[in-house]
């Protein structure tokens, strides 16, 4: 069966046919690094890591780009409120996201570009748009002329008359529906030079420029959360295609993590941070939970749903460990046809997991009957399927010191809370409190080092330091 994916733009299931045979190019909208990652943030990372693994299983050479938005109004505002440099704030939470992805077993991207590292490409894209009559400069700002692009709204289904960009009218806008490509410099804010005056890029411009730079004018798959369909992805399409690029050929969007039927969001105060979740369950169990629903479905969080997922994973894990105790090493086998059919059907993970549990049931029966060869074969198949989902307990990511990993994560949460108090005290010039926090951590065996990217901590041992 050929891999089929649901394409948001055409609203149909389409067979995946890459632009270049044997190669798959994928762009995932990454984090705006404004704060601690919560499980709603990282669901897309887990979901599209499964896509990447399945493409690799189809023998594609996958070039996977996940960007970092490290300049944004929210970053500037939160850094200013905390009295910290914007770049330090962004770097701190970029590391927090990297740590969360790493703990959840998400494969590192082929490249992870920062927006601030690609201003040159953004300026060039704006120049092309202005030359083609699709953008205009006004009072140091640059705007995209939405009416100049008749196909606007094709991705989201929005009619032009109904468009609201969710941004201010803007100085010099010809039409309130036009969106910002370049924001003129303001006192106290970072800026970069451009032919239209100093300023900084708009969010939509960043992704178009980075996707083209790393993947080319046309590439295979663009991924992201469903909340990005409009305006972000709609605007990406408009500016890239208006500039003459083919841009993405398939659009994939994952559903939200919800609580009480509402999207998990810091503005609603209903977030569950990744570090705090990892004090309750192991990282592999959290990944299993986040990846257990179909990627396009909403994932309604509840303690019971999490507990059920953990119990399900532990059932699989127990079968594999019992089998290994009886037969020794379990070689990785080949997934079943039913598993492959499910994954080829728009990554139907719930059906794929049903096949995993079917084999676990058969395997447990084989163990009870003393049919160890059958159990070994079934265990190998289960290992292969869990490997695609990124949760095989025997994989190096998970097969060492899981309890130590949970304890380390819990300690990191507590220490970073203290470091945040210290940073706030320093911003307030409350040196006594800042020193007291540092001394308290030192007495507990924790050394703090101030770096250009913010404070780092290490645990002191009898022989020295160990991160």
UniProtKB/Swiss-Prot annotation:
Its cofactor is Zn(2+). It catalyses: tRNA(Cys) + L-cysteine + ATP = L-cysteinyl-tRNA(Cys) + AMP + diphosphate. A motif ('HIGH' region) lies at residues 31-41. GO terms for biological process: cysteinyl-tRNA aminoacylation. It holds the Pfam family DALR_2. SMART domains: DALR_2. One of its GO terms (molecular function) is ATP binding. Keywords: Aminoacyl-tRNA synthetase, ATP-binding, Cytoplasm, Ligase, Metal-binding, Nucleotide-binding, Protein biosynthesis, Zinc. A motif ('KMSKS' region) lies at residues 263-267. Its EC number is 6.1.1.16. Zn(2+) binds at residues 29, 207, 232, 236. The keyword Amino-acid biosynthesis does not apply. Binds 1 zinc ion per subunit. Gene3D superfamilies: Cysteine-tRNA ligase, C-terminal anti-codon recognition domain, HUPs. ATP binds at residue 266. CDD domains: CysRS_core. Monomer. PANTHER family: CYSTEINE--TRNA LIGASE, CYSTEINYL-TRNA SYNTHETASE. This is Cysteine--tRNA ligase. It comes from Nocardia farcinica (strain IFM 10152). The lineage of its organism: Bacteria, Bacillati, Actinomycetota, Actinomycetes, Mycobacteriales.
């Amino acid at each position: 069966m050929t891999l089929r994916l649901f394409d948001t733009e055409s609203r149909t299931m389409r067979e995946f046919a890459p632009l270049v045979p044997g190669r798959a190019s994928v762009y995932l909208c990454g984090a705006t690094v404004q704060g601690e990652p919560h499980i709603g943030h990282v669901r897309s990372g887990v979901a599209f890591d499964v896509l990447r693994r399945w493409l690799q299983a189809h023998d594609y050479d996958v070039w996977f780009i996940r960007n970092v938005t490290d300049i944004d109004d929210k970053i500037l505002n939160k850094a200013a409120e905390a009295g910290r440099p914007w770049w330090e704030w962004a770097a701190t939470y970029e590391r927090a996201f990297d740590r969360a992805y790493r703990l959840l077993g998400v494969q590192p991207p082929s490249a992870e570009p920062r927006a601030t590292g690609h201003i040159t490409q953004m300026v060039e894209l704006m120049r092309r748009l202005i030359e083609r009559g699709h953008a205009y400069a006004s009072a140091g700002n640059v705007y995209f002329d939405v009416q100049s692009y008749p196909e606007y709204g094709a991705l989201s289904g929005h009619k032009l008359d109904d468009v609201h960009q969710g941004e201010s009218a803007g100085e010099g806008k010809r039409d309130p529906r036009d969106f910002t490509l370049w924001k003129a410099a303001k006192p106290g804010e970072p800026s970069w030079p451009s032919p239209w005056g100093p300023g900084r890029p708009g969010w939509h411009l960043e992704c178009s420029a980075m996707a083209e730079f790393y993947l080319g004018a046309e590439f295979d798959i663009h991924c992201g959360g469903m909340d990005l369909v409009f305006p972000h992805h709609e605007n990406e399409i408009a500016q890239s295609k208006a500039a003459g690029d083919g841009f993405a050929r398939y659009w994939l969007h994952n559903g939200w993590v919800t609580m009480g039927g509402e999207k998990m969001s810091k503005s609603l105060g209903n977030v569950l941070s990744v570090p705090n979740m990892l004090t309750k369950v192991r990282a592999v169990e959290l990944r299993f939970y986040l990846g257990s629903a179909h990627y396009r479905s909403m994932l309604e969080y509840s303690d019971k749903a999490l507990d059920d997922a953990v119990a399900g994973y532990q059932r699989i894990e127990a079968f594999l460990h019992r089998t290994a105790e009886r037969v020794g090493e379990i070689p990785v086998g080949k997934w079943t046809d039913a598993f492959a059919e499910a994954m080829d059907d728009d990554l139907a993970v719930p059906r794929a997991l049903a096949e995993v549990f079917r084999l676990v049931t058969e395997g447990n029966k084989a163990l009870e009957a003393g049919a160890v060869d059958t159990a070994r074969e079934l265990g190998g198949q289960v290992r292969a399927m869990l490997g695609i989902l990124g949760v095989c307990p025997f994989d190096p990511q998970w097969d060492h010191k899981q309890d130590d990993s949970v304890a380390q994560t819990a300690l990191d949460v507590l220490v970073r809370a203290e470091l945040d108090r210290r940073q706030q005290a320093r911003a307030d010039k409350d040196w006594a409190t800042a020193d007291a926090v540092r001394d308290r951590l030192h007495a507990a065996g924790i050394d703090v080092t101030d770096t250009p990217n913010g404070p780092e901590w290490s645990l002191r041992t009898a022989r020295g330091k160990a991160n």
